[in-house]
């Protein structure tokens, strides 16, 4: 099974973050501009939470709050569940299911080195299965 390190090597390690005191509107703009569903909420080098489109929908829109006047701190999900580069894709999927989260920051030596989403994991599993199918077909035809 593929490790998170291998997945990050393929997809890239670009991180998008926001400060806890920033307005939710700014977070939504960054997510839209970067085509991502969540941002790390960072205080310096420390992760204080994650803010996602789901947090926005449930904690701003449904509550009738203003995205321009609400700080990210008020809607972020915390504490954050993290994984290490050695964690398997399978273990990440298990954690996401158990904790009902869609994004996992990846930490190494106390630093955030990437983030994986449920979409990243599904793509990795599909690619791995496709490779296995191709190997089996090659074996059968040889």
Model-derived features: where do they sit?
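A glycine-centered beta-loop-beta connector
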Residues: 31-34, 39-55, 96, 104-119
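Tandem CBS (Bateman) regulatory domains
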Residues: 1-13, 52-82, 88-97, 118-142
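A positional/architectural concept
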Residues: 2-48
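The conserved cystathionine-beta-synthase
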Residues: 17-35, 82-100, 107
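Short, charge-rich amphipathic segments
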Residues: 22-33, 62-74, 110-111
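Secondary-structure boundary/capping motif
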Residues: 16, 48, 114, 124-125
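Short, surface-exposed, polar/charged, turn-prone segments marking secondary-structure boundaries
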Residues: 35, 44-46, 67-70, 77-79, ...
């Amino acid at each position: 099974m593929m490790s998170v390190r291998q997945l990050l090597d393929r997809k890239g390690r670009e991180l998008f973050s926001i400060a806890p005191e920033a307005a939710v509107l700014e977070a939504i703009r960054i997510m839209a501009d970067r085509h991502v569903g969540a941002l790390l909420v960072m205080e310096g080098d420390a992760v204080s939470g994650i803010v996602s489109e789901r947090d926005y929908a449930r904690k701003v829109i449904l509550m009738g709050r203003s995205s321009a006047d609400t700080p990210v701190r008020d809607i972020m999900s915390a504490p954050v569940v993290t994984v290490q580069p050695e964690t398997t894709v399978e273990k990440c999927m298990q954690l996401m299911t158990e904790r009902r989260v869609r994004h996992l920051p990846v930490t190494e030596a106390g630093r955030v080195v990437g983030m994986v989403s449920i979409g990243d994991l599904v793509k990795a599993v599909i690619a791995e299965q496709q490779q296995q199918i191709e190997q089996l077909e090659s074996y059968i035809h040889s």
